[in-house]
């Protein structure tokens, strides 16, 4: 009787593990599809530190115009097992003076929050992030100080961005150099 109970429990445990693996498999299949369909602009590149782990990767954006021209910004992507029903977690690893990216690397992009839906993909996020560098949005800021400066004194904002990208202090915050050249 005890052996029968043990066998039933093992079977149940095996089924639960199988269903968990199916969820991960669905996320892996979808991310594989998204990566195969990536159409990166020449200002973006991906890096997979572990080629066997497609759920964790880096996106490097190097804008060729706008305030952030000639900068190099690295974003870490962490894709969860509920992808595409939940968006990936995206953080900026490069500290940047930007209204929509806070000093901890959190990114304010609507499709990473309330506007996410399963028909969106990694390509959508790449273009959204790239757009943030071309057109920072002071109306929906994470870095309120940068947003205020952008709204009230565009020239000062541009100077602050350049100073931060060269490696310097803006206010009390020191930024590492992130220039390509």
Swiss-Prot record:
Its EC number is 2.3.2.34. The active site is at residue 108. GO terms for molecular function: ATP binding; NEDD8 conjugating enzyme activity; NEDD8 transferase activity. GO terms for biological process: negative regulation of smoothened signaling pathway; positive regulation of peptidoglycan recognition protein signaling pathway; protein modification process; protein neddylation. CDD domains: UBCc_UBE2F_UBE2M. Residues 26-170 form the UBC core domain. It catalyses: [E1 NEDD8-activating enzyme]-S-[NEDD8 protein]-yl-L-cysteine + [E2 NEDD8-conjugating enzyme]-L-cysteine = [E1 NEDD8-activating enzyme]-L-cysteine + [E2 NEDD8-conjugating enzyme]-S-[NEDD8-protein]-yl-L-cysteine. InterPro entries: Ub_conjugating_enzyme (IPR050113), UBQ-conjugat_E2_core (IPR000608), UBQ-conjugating_AS (IPR023313), UBQ-conjugating_enzyme/RWD (IPR016135). Expressed in the wing disk. Signal peptide: none annotated. Accepts the ubiquitin-like protein Nedd8 from the Uba3-APP-BP1 E1 complex and catalyzes its covalent attachment to other proteins. Required for Cul1 and Cul3 neddylation. Negatively regulates full-length ci stability and hedgehog signaling. Belongs to the ubiquitin-conjugating enzyme family. UBC12 subfamily. Interacts with Uba3. This is Nedd8-conjugating enzyme UbcE2M. The gene is UbcE2M.
């Amino acid at each position: 009787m005890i052996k029968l109970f043990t066998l039933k429990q093992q079977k149940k445990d095996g089924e639960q593990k199988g269903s968990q693996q199916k969820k991960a498999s669905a996320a892996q299949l979808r991310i594989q599809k998204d990566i195969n369909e990536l159409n990166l602009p020449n200002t973006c590149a991906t890096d997979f530190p572990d080629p066997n782990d497609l759920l964790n990767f880096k996106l490097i954006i190097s804008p060729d115009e706008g305030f952030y021209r000639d900068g190099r910004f690295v974003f870490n992507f962490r894709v969860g097992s509920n992808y595409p029903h939940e968006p990936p977690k995206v953080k900026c690893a490069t500290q940047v003076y930007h209204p929509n990216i806070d000093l901890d690397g959190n990114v304010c992009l609507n499709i990473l929050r309330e506007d996410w839906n399963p028909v969106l993909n990694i390509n959508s996020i790449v273009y959204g992030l790239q757009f943030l560098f071309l057109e920072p949005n002071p109306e929906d800021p994470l870095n309120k100080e940068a947003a205020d400066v952008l709204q009230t004194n565009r020239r000062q904002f541009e100077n602050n961005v350049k100073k931060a990208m060269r490696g310097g202090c803006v206010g009390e915050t020191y930024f590492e150099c992130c220039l390509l050249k």
